[in-house]
């Protein structure tokens, strides 16, 4: 956990990033974690390569994560960016990352999802971007729901989904890194998606419910910022 305060210090002092109403966000996350033992998947919109770090720092402090390590979300970075060497693989594991190759071999992706499912079933929190990649338009693409997240949620009985919408005040489009001095607005919504469909249709239905909720949160944030 040594990396956590270092990462927060870099974001806060190095880049000058701020989370607006941070204590409200953290209080809500603590309530969610204390309110149920059900599996929890955090699903978020995706605008930059550092969204996972921004969201993790918004949901809890390094000290709180040290006492509640299972609440620090696992995430799935692109293998080509982070998993290309043994040293990097060790580092990303310590940082609670399970690298995945986007658009790679289905069996390899299935193994990653199985690992993520195992972690979630044991009480670990997992962070996923249900649109499957960074938004090209800078907005949530409600029609671009990846069925993988729906399959994961559907395979975990009673699974809850914490939808997290995060956006920098100056963010108008997709970028690699948020701007220096950026201030982030976050909205959280806890849902439990259900579907009577079966197979792939069920997975897609669950995914669309999640992305649809992110779209609703986006509209709230944009109205507030206007």
Where are the model-predicted features located?
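Non-catalytic C-terminal accessory region of glycerolipid acyltransferases
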Residues: 38, 106-226
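Catalytic core of membrane glycerolipid acyltransferases/transacylases, capturing the structured
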Residues: 34-104
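Conserved beta-strand scaffold positions in the cores of enzyme catalytic domains, especially
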Residues: 19, 75, 97-99, 161, ...
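Alpha-helical membrane-targeting segments
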Residues: 1-18, 84-96, 110, 178-181
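A short, well-structured juxtamembrane/interface segment
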Residues: 9-39, 190
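Short regulatory "switch" loops immediately downstream of catalytic or recognition motifs
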Residues: 22-31, 56-63, 194
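Short, flexible loop segments at the rims of nucleotide/cofactor-binding pockets, characterized by
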Residues: 10-20, 102-107, 138-140
């Amino acid at each position: 956990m040594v990396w956590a305060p270092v990462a927060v210090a870099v974001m806060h002092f190095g880049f000058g990033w701020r989370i607006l109403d941070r204590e409200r966000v953290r209080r809500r996350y603590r309530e969610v974690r204390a309110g149920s033992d059900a599996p929890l998947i955090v699903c978020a919109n995706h605008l930059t390569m550092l969204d996972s770090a921004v969201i993790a720092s918004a949901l809890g402090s390094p000290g709180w994560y040290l006492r509640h390590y299972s609440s620090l979300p696992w995430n799935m970075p692109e293998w080509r960016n982070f998993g290309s060497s043994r040293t990097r693989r060790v580092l990303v594991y310590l940082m609670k990352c399970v690298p995945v190759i986007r658009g790679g071999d289905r069996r390899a992706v299935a193994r990653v999802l199985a690992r993520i499912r195992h972690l979630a079933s044991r009480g670990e929190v997992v962070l996923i971007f249900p649109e499957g990649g960074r938004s090209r338009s800078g907005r949530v693409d409600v029609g671009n729901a990846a069925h993988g997240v729906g399959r994961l949620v559907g395979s975990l009985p009673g699974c809850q989904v914490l939808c997290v919408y995060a956006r920098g005040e100056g963010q108008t489009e997709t970028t690699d890194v948020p701007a220096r001095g950026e201030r982030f607005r976050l909205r959280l919504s806890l849902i439990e998606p259900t579907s009577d469909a079966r197979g792939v249709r069920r997975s897609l239905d669950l995914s669309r419910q999640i992305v649809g909720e992110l779209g609703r949160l986006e509209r709230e944030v944009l109205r507030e910022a206007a």
